[in-house]
Amino acid sequence: MEKGQMLYEGKAKKVYTTDQEGIYWVEYKDDATAFNGEKKGTIGDKGIVNNRLSALLFEVLEKTGIPTHFIELLNDREMLVRKLEMIPLEVVVRNIAAGSLAKRLGVAEGLKLSRPVVELYYKDDALGDPFVNESHSLAMGWAEERDLKEIQELGLKINGELQKILDQAGIILVDFKLEFGKAEGKVYLGDEISPDTCRFWDKETQEKLDKDRFRRDLGKVEEAYAEVYRRVKEVLKD
């Protein structure tokens, strides 16, 4: 497999073509951003953690019947993925009130929700990825009705599978963001699953083990990312 031209450079990843149709080469970066790009920095070895952790979790999800774009882990920072036509929506699943939900509803951060909440956000950096609903998504043509239903159902299924793993790792899955795309008419999970896209809290201390440490200047960001990977890898080593 040959790495081709860079197609796109985002906040956290670079995407390249390959010499094989329908396959992309993804490189994970150490760059970090928050508040829609207003805050910028670097988190040491973030790219390594996010690449390797995503690969581990994608493999587990595939075994449970959840289709992902993951094909192969190449090295510490790079993986091969299936080319997808991305659905321009973020699916956010919340188990505990935190971040924008706590602020929007005026509830204390850490409130355990009686059931998981699924939210949709329109992917548009210029607009700040606004919170939208199913009606908006259908009216604007961002997704077909059956795909909209499927990505929300997959979000809940992924939530259940990740919680099983993370609970064994002593980690609370507070909330997380997913992105989906389509290839040959089939919906696949894309993007990544990492401390960049999830809120992880230590089960005993409620210490934050995710990008909130960068957002809120809590320090020990690199250590938190590495700790999540270490714990998940330990749980999945067999």
Swiss-Prot record:
GO annotation (BP), single: 'de novo' IMP biosynthetic process
Enzyme class: ligase
Entries under InterPro entries matching the protein: SAICAR_synt/ADE2_N, SAICAR_synt_PurC, SAICAR_synth, SAICAR_synthetase, SAICAR_synthetase_CS
One annotated GO molecular function: ATP binding
Pathway assignment: Purine metabolism; IMP biosynthesis via de novo pathway; 5-amino-1-(5-phospho-D-ribosyl)imidazole-4-carboxamide from 5-amino-1-(5-phospho-D-ribosyl)imidazole-4-carboxylate: step 1/2
Keywords of this entry: ATP-binding, Ligase, Nucleotide-binding, Purine biosynthesis
Catalyzed reactions per annotation: 5-amino-1-(5-phospho-D-ribosyl)imidazole-4-carboxylate + L-aspartate + ATP = (2S)-2-[5-amino-1-(5-phospho-beta-D-ribosyl)imidazole-4-carboxamido]succinate + ADP + phosphate + 2 H(+)
E.C. number: 6.3.2.6
Entry similarity comment: Belongs to the SAICAR synthetase family.
Entry-linked HAMAP family: SAICAR_synth (MF_00137)
Record's protein name: Phosphoribosylaminoimidazole-succinocarboxamide synthase
